[in-house]
Amino acid sequence: MKALVRKLGNIHPDHQRIFKGAFRVAVFLLLGKAAGAIKEMAVAYRYGVSDAVDAYQFTMTMGTWLPVTIVGVLSVVLIPVLVRLARTGGAEKELFIRELQGWVAAAGVALALLTWFAWPYVVERLGQGLSAQVRAMTGDLLIAFAPVAALLLIAGISAARLRAQERHVNTLLDSVPAVATLAWVMLAASAEGVGPLLWGTLVGYAIQTVWLAWLAARADGGFWGAPKLTLRSPHWPELMGAAGVMLIGQVAMSFVGPLDQYAAANLGANANATLGYASRLLSLLLGIGAVSVGRAALPVLADVQARGDTARARSMALKWSLLMVAAGAGAVALGWVLAPWGVSVLFERGAFTAENTAAVAHVLRWGLLQLPFYFGVLILVQLLASQNRYRIMAAIAVANFALKAVLNTVLAPRMGAAGIMLATSLMYVLSFACYLAVAMRKAEPKEAD
């Protein structure tokens, strides 16, 4: 035992920072995903595989894809900037945060209005396979998801401020919307309509946004960062250039969710709901297994890059990536065997039948195949982000989306919702191969590759 402790103590401090951060994120993710799983159990109990769940899944995916995409881009390009600003601090950092929060808040309001007014066209174009009742329900749910578009942007900035300081409590607060929805669904007098899903979602995201803002201010010594609509910070050109390039790839990848919803909607027979249950179970494994390491790695790798030690950052990322591939392969084997049991334990009660369990487990198994490649690629994404290699990242993302779009049209008609999951798995095979090939190159990255 003492020998093991000594061996662990000899691990490089940067590896220890990633491990400790990943452990904290994994614990928070486990708690958060547990809350999410309980919420899904409650939804399955009250609604089963029904029109209400179809509407909820469709509206949540379509209504949040753009703000989630923007937050994803900002997180990747913001954290290295915030890590560097942490070394300087003072008025320069405060000005940047105030301006950032001002423009993000303005963009959030604009995005909420855009979501509201564009929704009829979204449903008309992408929800052609939905019944009239489901379409009407999506309109009701928009009362929640239009404001949520703005709240997601504001919360994303607060989360990035926390992550830049290697504080990962924001991961735990990702569960707040699920907890609020759970409470509304279980306390509702009946499961008629989508009211409990609507109000639980809206209140949950509002609480999460305020809570994250308070934690970010406390982490910055009480600095809230009153919004300011100016562009005087010298960091804007760097940030906007990187964000513009990243947004191209991220928008392409963000269409994967709506693309899946479109394919499932055209399959009919509540395929949206079946795919949604399987996807949310899969997200539990993806989150705990890979997101924990990815979120912990970016600020550490950015700090190593800021010190000028590019070779160490590359070596660290490759070691962690291969370790995560092995862990993902083990998760596939275990998950394939336990899929029917897991779906049954979580969902099979109330309106959710044994037939529903078999359908969701079948789809889930095909989705499990993505685990090794998703696990492995996420740490390599953080490496390239810390090196500002955004053009390469954008190109890989566009290639991923192109492959996914082709495979959906080929596999979904033949395999149903399982084909949609298999297409996602093959997409991540391509992604991992591309990122590994780029990461293996020993050439020094350019300033803005």
Feature names for model-found ranges:
Residues 2-18, 22, 213-253, 441-449:
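Interhelical loop/hinge segments that connect adjacent transmembrane helices in multipass membrane
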Residues 19-23, 57, 61, 78, ...:
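Interfacial transmembrane-helix starts/ends
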Residues 44-64, 136, 238, 242, ...:
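Interfacial/gating helices of multi-pass transporter permease domains
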Residues 72-88, 291-309, 381:
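Helix-loop junctions and terminal segments of transmembrane helices
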Residues 111-132, 332-354:
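Short membrane-interface helical motifs at transmembrane helix boundaries
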Residues 173-219, 399-403, 417-441:
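Hydrophobic alpha-helical transmembrane segments
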